[in-house]
């Protein structure tokens, strides 16, 4: 963030093959955002089970009895299917949702959107989420796209276009990261 509290990187991408640390990177960013910055985060995935898996991993961090200092930060953890959410006493929160045309409705004050499995992300899904962000009063936002390299016939052109834009002509507020085996 800059001196005024705005994100210096507003669009970031991470493309790595499976089992290469993508979720650990996301969990670190989400944990930091909630605990330190009090951010309201929307974590989206292409399937319910993927969103649920990410929720369960992050929820374990906030319920681990070996870390009472983290337990003390928690206001509420909602485990209801389709309404998974972690809320902190400092106002930070994260909600998990499978993507659809209506998936982002009802989320207020979101400053960070995580598009997990973004190789499956479609223009319609982005449009639905961006409409929610446009109504947000935070004044600042960050979008993070994470996924594996798209396979042939993959429905999500958004991730591919985002990567191309960041590598060919990166904007001042763009970041793109990827790693894989050479060759």
Model-derived segments and spans:
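Phosphate/NTP-binding elements of NTP-utilizing enzymes
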Residues: 1-183
């Amino acid at each position: 963030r800059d001196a005024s509290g705005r994100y210096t990187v507003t669009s970031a991408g991470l493309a790595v093959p499976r089992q290469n640390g993508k979720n650990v990177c996301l969990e670190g960013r989400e944990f930091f955002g909630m605990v330190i910055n009090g951010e309201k985060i929307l974590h989206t995935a292409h399937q319910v089970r993927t969103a649920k898996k990410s929720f369960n991993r992050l929820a374990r961090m906030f319920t681990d009895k070996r870390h009472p200092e983290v337990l003390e930060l928690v206001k509420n953890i909602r485990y209801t299917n389709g309404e998974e959410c972690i809320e902190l006493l400092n106002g930070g929160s994260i909600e998990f949702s499978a993507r659809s045309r209506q998936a982002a409705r009802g989320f207020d004050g979101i400053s960070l959107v995580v598009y997990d499995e973004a190789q499956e992300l479609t223009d319609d899904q982005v449009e639905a989420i961006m409409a929610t962000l446009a109504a947000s009063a935070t004044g600042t936002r960050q979008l993070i796209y994470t996924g594996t390299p798209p396979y042939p016939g993959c429905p999500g052109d958004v991730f591919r276009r985002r990567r191309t834009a960041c590598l060919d002509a990166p904007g001042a507020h763009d970041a793109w990261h990827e790693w894989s085996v050479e060759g």
